Regions:
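Acceptor/aglycone-binding surface of glycosyltransferases and processive sugar-polymer synthases
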Residues: 153-163
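Glycine-rich N-terminal loop/short-helix segment of MobA-like nucleotidyltransferase
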Residues: 2-29, 42-44, 236
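Generic preference for hydrophobic
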Residues: 25, 76-77, 141, 234
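Catalytic-core segments of class I nucleotidyltransferases/pyrophosphorylases
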Residues: 116, 123, 129-136, 161-261
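Conserved N-terminal catalytic core of the sugar/cofactor nucleotidyltransferase
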Residues: 2-5, 31-119, 130, 181, ...
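A generic "binding-loop/recognition-motif" signal
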Residues: 10, 21, 56, 80, ...
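Phosphate- and divalent-cation-binding pockets in alpha/beta enzyme and binding domains
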Residues: 13, 59-62, 86, 92, ...
Length: 261
């Protein structure tokens, strides 16, 4: 299987570090954020990795070359021309994700292998093999979530199926639950927590949203758009700890968190 690391962000909340570095190369507890992610994937047996780049892309490419890709097969999806958000970024990377790592040909489709998707700036203690075992190839995928305080939530029904999205600060609701006639009972708000396992059929679901929104869209937008027809389920890991290393003020806390993993 392959993994996709989202590493193209501008890292504006990590300024001034990201005035000279891409977010992926911000140092943390003796390693870069990117190295933390690659090593977690490698420890789980995943060595075929695709990652997108935009901000200081050359520095990331040079860093990978200098470190021999950390012993992995890493391919780069170049977004220097346009930052595409998570959904658009995954879509652009499709030829790399669905091709054989030996041939790099998009004609050699890996139709049955799920795609593990993660953010370079989210650290966690997640048990990746357990997550992959929970994946059902008959469904569209799993979204790692947890009950925590935030403003924006994914909404799941009593079978853990995604049925919408809400911003509790503004009252905005999107997805199937926004239809008053939709038969949903016992919904639960859960916060997205940095990782997804997706059926490669996800790529066939993107064209309609691209027609509506253009090439730039988030995976959350895509999930909400397809939730009525496709099954995406919540995955709540046991004893889960995660940290979004998104702000310069959090780096000291993140150092301690990373050291505890």
């Amino acid at each position: 299987m392959k993994a996709m690391i989202f590493a193209a962000g501008l890292g504006t909340r990590l300024k001034p570090l990201t005035d000279t570095l891409p977010k992926a190369l911000v140092p943390l507890a003796g390693k870069t954020l990117l190295q933390w992610q690659i090593e977690r994937l490698k420890a789980a047996g995943i060595t075929d990795i695709v990652m997108n780049v935009h901000h200081f892309a050359d520095k990331i490419i040079d860093y990978l070359r200098q470190n021999d890709n950390f012993g992995c097969n890493i391919q780069v999806s170049d977004e220097r021309d346009m930052l595409l958000e998570t959904g658009g970024g995954l879509r652009k990377a499709q030829p790399l994700i669905t091709s054989s790592p030996l041939t790099s040909s998009p004609n050699s489709l890996i139709t049955s292998s799920p795609i593990l998707v993660c953010n370079v700036d989210i650290l966690s203690n997640i048990d990746i093999p357990a997550l992959l075992r929970a994946y059902n190839p008959e469904e569209m995928g799993l979204v790692v979530v947890m009950p925590r305080d935030t403003q924006r939530y994914l909404v799941f029904d009593d079978t853990q199926r995604l049925c919408g999205w809400t911003n509790i600060a503004t009252g905005e609701v999107r997805g199937p639950i926004s239809n008053s006639q939709y038969p949903i009972a016992n919904t639960r708000n859960l916060a997205f927590s940095g990782m997804h396992v997706l059926n490669p059929r996800i790529f066939s679901c993107m064209d309609e949203l691209v027609a509506l929104k253009g090439e730039k869209f988030s995976l959350i937008d895509l999930y909400v758009h397809i939730a009525e027809k496709e099954v995406l389920r919540a995955y709540i890991p046991e004893n889960y700890r995660m940290m979004d290393v998104g702000k310069i003020s959090q780096l000291s806390e993140a150092e301690a968190f990373a050291a505890s993993l």
